[in-house]
Swiss-Prot record:
Site feature (Important for catalytic activity) residues: 221
Domain of life: Bacteria
Presence of keyword Manganese: no
Residue ranges of coiled coil: none
UniProt-recorded name of the protein: Adenosine deaminase
A GO BP entry: hypoxanthine salvage
Similarity section: Belongs to the metallo-dependent hydrolases superfamily. Adenosine and AMP deaminases family. Adenosine deaminase subfamily.
GO MF assignments: 2'-deoxyadenosine deaminase activity; adenosine deaminase activity; zinc ion binding
């Protein structure tokens, strides 16, 4: 089955986890940024999971170097443009790129300049390729609460101009949602859609709280609802979409293999799952690769994929007009 030619939608892709290695090297040389190696084959080991990874925290260490080259307007625009260029080549028709603006203030940029630069790269790619992109702003859970309020407030002016949603990301502790009730209340009042990283690192109850306390409309990962009956029931009853990233989940040791990943069980039980990369460079993956792995190890069929694609259309934070266009591509999903 040729998954490459099929239309695709990406709802969970981190900008700083999806840089081209060549771009990291090019910017580092241009801006005199020290790297542990300027040899491409050696540098890959610092930014990608090549063989093994022991935990989510170890996985997150791979973002240190990419963020060093994402501190100027020019570089942010270029990296956003290249991401859309790369996924368009994989026949992705719509992507929601997520990133945390406060990771890019090291050289004095303010939040507005950072968001503007990424949006400029997205819009430039839209002009050249058959793709539409929107932006999700991330609040880092390892930063303080005032910083989350700052992102929500300063990003609000871009709602309707390419920014569609707010997210909470980084390492996951039990019962984190309770800390962010007021932040997400403000986000909802501002007009942001809400997606929350939860249930990625072993705590299914976090999904329950993200929905009940934070009004999450979508859940990033969410795979550990399998260990929390109450969360599973709520996700199914409320038809909450899960942004599932199988290869990333293997890398963070959430699961040992594709065969033991609950993705297909969720799909067969009517949970609204979508398929995503999480981080194309860190996990050395594409949507096509994700589909090929699920086909090879879990028996994903073309009929299954059509359900996944339409799930992603419905779950997206795209405009009604864009959703209609995306729905029309479903006719191309044939073996």
């Amino acid at each position: 089955m040729n998954f490459k030619k099929l239309p695709k939608i990406e709802l969970h892709c981190h900008l700083d986890g999806s840089l081209r290695i060549d771009t990291i090297l090019d910017i580092a040389k241009k801006d005199n940024i020290p790297l542990p190696s300027y040899n491409k084959k050696e540098l890959i080991n610092y930014v990608s999971i090549m063989d093994d990874c022991n935990s989510l925290d170890e996985y997150l260490n791979k973002f240190f170097i990419p963020n060093k080259v994402m501190q100027t307007k020019e570089n942010l625009k270029r990296i956003a443009f290249e991401l859309l260029e790369d996924v368009a080549a994989d026949n992705v028709k719509y992507i929601e790129v997520r990133f945390a603006p406060l990771l890019h203030v090291e050289k004095g940029l303010n939040i507005e300049e950072i968001i503007e630069s990424v949006l400029a790269g997205i819009k430039e790619a839209e002009k050249l390729y058959d793709i539409k992109g929107n932006l999700i702003l991330g609040c880092m859970r390892n930063m303080d609460i005032p910083s989350a309020f700052e992102v929500v407030k300063k990003g609000a002016k871009f709602i309707g101009k390419g920014v569609v949603a707010i997210d909470l990301c980084a390492g996951e502790e039990p019962h984190f949602p309770g800390k962010y009730i007021e932040v997400l209340k403000l986000a909802k009042e501002c007009g942001y859609r809400i997606t929350i990283h939860a249930g990625e690192a072993g705590v299914g109850e976090n999904v329950l709280e993200a929905i009940n306390l934070l009004n999450a409309e979508r859940i990033g990962h969410g795979i550990y609802i399998k260990n929390c009956a109450e969360a599973y029931k709520l996700v199914k009853e409320k038809n909450i979409p899960l942004e599932v990233c199988p290869t990333s989940n293997l890398h963070t040791k959430a699961f040992e293999s594709y065969e033991t990943h609950p993705f297909m069980d969720f799909l067969k039980d009517g949970i609204k799952v979508t398929i995503n990369t999480d981080n194309m460079t860190v996990s050395n993956t594409t949507i096509t690769k994700e589909l090929e792995m699920l086909n090879k190890f879990c028996g994903l069929s073309i009929e299954d994929y059509k359900i996944l694609y339409l799930n992603a259309v419905e779950a997206s934070f795209a405009s009604p007009e864009t959703k209609e266009i995306l729905k029309s591509y479903a006719n191309e999903i044939t073996a």
